[in-house]
Amino acid sequence: MSTLSPRRSAILTFIRDRIAQQGQSPSLAEISEAFGFASRSVARKHIVALTEAGLIEVVAHQARGIRLLNSEPRPELLEIPVLGRVAAGAPIGPDLDIHTTLHLDRSTFTRVPDYLLRVQGDSMIEDGILDGDLVGVHRNPQASDGQIVVARLEGEVTIKRLQHRGDQLHLLPRNPAYQPIIVTPDQDFAIEGVFCGLVRRE
């Protein structure tokens, strides 16, 4: 493998950091913006070069499908329960019985998910999370600004981006057709877990 240029090394670090911080890889548009490229085609050329160098792969037909490659000789399969639905729209009531169990490649996820939820709605489409997707959830009652979380608000469950504003929490949709959900201190609210990847059934 040839030595990476400083620019491509920086792009690889950007991808790795974004996956670690937000649970998903950046889009070509986000890479272009971060590095000041004039168009997405420039970012695409760098992604192709990193792919040819064996450092990443791009999963076809999968949203934000850049995956970091490692030296493991064979995939590690995880057995993950599917626990019903999560709203990408208005929150919905909990439906957390085990529906089925799937065996999925560990490399699909940025961290090992404790369970999967099926997305209902389209409020997260700009983050590449579509109606019908299965999202991996890593149980964690805490999350940082900008992370995608599965949260329970007044007994109902939703998936949104988390943002702190003063003593309020905002659950941000990623579709301009939806309004943010503002969580006040008097409401019954808990973060159930952090998004760590998705599976899309074609």
Swiss-Prot record:
InterPro entries: LexA, LexA-like, LexA/Signal_pep-like_sf, LexA_DNA-bd_dom, LexA_repressor, Peptidase_S24_LexA, Peptidase_S24_S26A/B/C, WH-like_DNA-bd_sf
A GO molecular-function descriptor: serine-type endopeptidase activity
GO biological process: DNA repair; DNA replication; negative regulation of DNA-templated transcription; proteolysis; SOS response
SUPFAM superfamilies referenced in this protein's UniProt entry, alphabetically: LexA/Signal peptidase (SSF51306), Winged helix' DNA-binding domain (SSF46785)
UniProt KW keywords: Autocatalytic cleavage, DNA damage, DNA repair, DNA replication, DNA-binding, Hydrolase, Repressor, SOS response, Transcription, Transcription regulation
Active site residues according to the UniProt entry: 123, 160
Presence of the UniProt keyword GTP-binding in the record: no
Catalyzed reactions per annotation: Hydrolysis of Ala-|-Gly bond in repressor LexA
Site feature (Cleavage) residues: 88-89
Coiled coil: none
Membrane-crossing segments per the record: none
Residue ranges of the annotated DNA-binding region, renumbered to this chain: 28-48
EC number: 3.4.21.88
Keyword Ribonucleoprotein: no
Assembly and binders: Homodimer.
Family assignment from sequence similarity: Belongs to the peptidase S24 family.
Reported function: Represses a number of genes involved in the response to DNA damage (SOS response), including recA and lexA. In the presence of single-stranded DNA, RecA interacts with LexA causing an autocatalytic cleavage which disrupts the DNA-binding part of LexA, leading to derepression of the SOS regulon and eventually DNA repair.
Record-given protein name: LexA repressor 2
Lineage of producing organism: Bacteria, Pseudomonadati, Pseudomonadota, Gammaproteobacteria, Pseudomonadales
